[in-house]
From Swiss-Prot:
Stretches of the chain found on the membrane's Extracellular side: 149-368
Organism of this sequence: Drosophila melanogaster (Fruit fly)
Bilayer-spanning residue ranges: 128-148
Biased composition (Low complexity): 33-43, 102-113
Biological process (GO), any one: response to bacterium
UniProt KW rRNA-binding keyword: no
Cytoplasmic side: 1-127
UniProt main location, coarse: membrane
Record region (Disordered): 21-46, 101-122
Gene3D superfamilies named among the record's database cross-references: Peptidoglycan recognition protein-like
Entry protein name: Peptidoglycan-recognition protein LA
Entry GO CC: plasma membrane
Domain N-acetylmuramoyl-L-alanine amidase positions: 233-320
Annotated gene: PGRP-LA
Family to which the UniProt record says this protein belongs: Belongs to the N-acetylmuramoyl-L-alanine amidase 2 family.
Amino acid sequence: MFEENNSPTTDNSLWTLQGRQRASPAQRLHNLTSAGSSTSSSGLPLPQNIFTNPAIQPSSVINLNHSTDVVIGPMTQYQGPVSIYYMDYMEAHAMQTAAGINSNNANGNGNANRSRDKSPSRRVTRNTILLITLILLVLATGLIVLYVELNRPKPELPSNKAIYFGNNYDHQTFPNLGNGHLVVDREQWGASKNSHGLTIPLKRPIPYVLITHIGVQSLPCDNIYKCSIKMRTIQDSAIAEKGLPDIQSNFYVSEEGNIYVGRGWDWANTYANQTLAITFMGDYGRFKPGPKQLEGVQFLLAHAVANRNIDVDYKLVAQNQTKVTRSPGAYVYQEIRNWPHFYGCGMDEAPACGIELGMKTESWDAKQ
């Protein structure tokens, strides 16, 4: 309650507020209903200008001692039922976070729906661009390949003439026989460097051509790779097992009709000095010679005649006409006996082969 100060002055601003006990609810209601009169809790009248006089500064003259439930300043009072909810910081933060997540989910779902609405058209556009790019790359590649193929120099096709060489042929650079019959030199099929020096030269033109085969169940070879291996095997066997200085024959003919150089034009073969030995690569007691193989031998003979390596009237004989052997095989023998230069020496009552040259039986098995 308010009490008047004992100071002799009567200034209305010198009032002090002393502590009082907490009023009961009934007393508070009575105070509210009697708000029309300005009295203190003790029934003493308050000065009328205590709240309206600007000269009065209660903050400088009011002392609070052992008081409770004191309000200084404006206060709002509610009459009627009021519901007050208390929410601590954690609950408020959780609700705000949940609201944010829901908002984000709503935005995300909206964006996803919009993306799903737009993604098919984007996917179609992307696939179309990729397809067009791929087609353009394929077309460009095809055009480049076509251009390269059209501008690649074409190899000269061999002629189908019987003889393909002029008189200026150099035997040290053996040419292609034409018509697909290649000549594979010693360096090309990988001749061994361990061969011993050959000492018996061939005198040209050569009067006899001797036809042999490899035999011993040898399979015909049909490409340069396989035939080159076979040539090296024959040479190794001749040097290591038979004690010969080099491979036996002058030339070898494969199934595809290619010519492989053995001792060549300059050196005598291992059979007889005055002969040019041509060997069919395979066992022709078991296999038939192919048409390209037979043609390759004929082309080689035509080339040799044109260049005077063999006599114009050369005599063609099979090895079994000169000694007891199955070479060159029954199938080859059936073919060559019908060739124009075949010579039937050593058969039935015919004279021995080479007798006109002074050759004896031993001359056809020189092993040199």
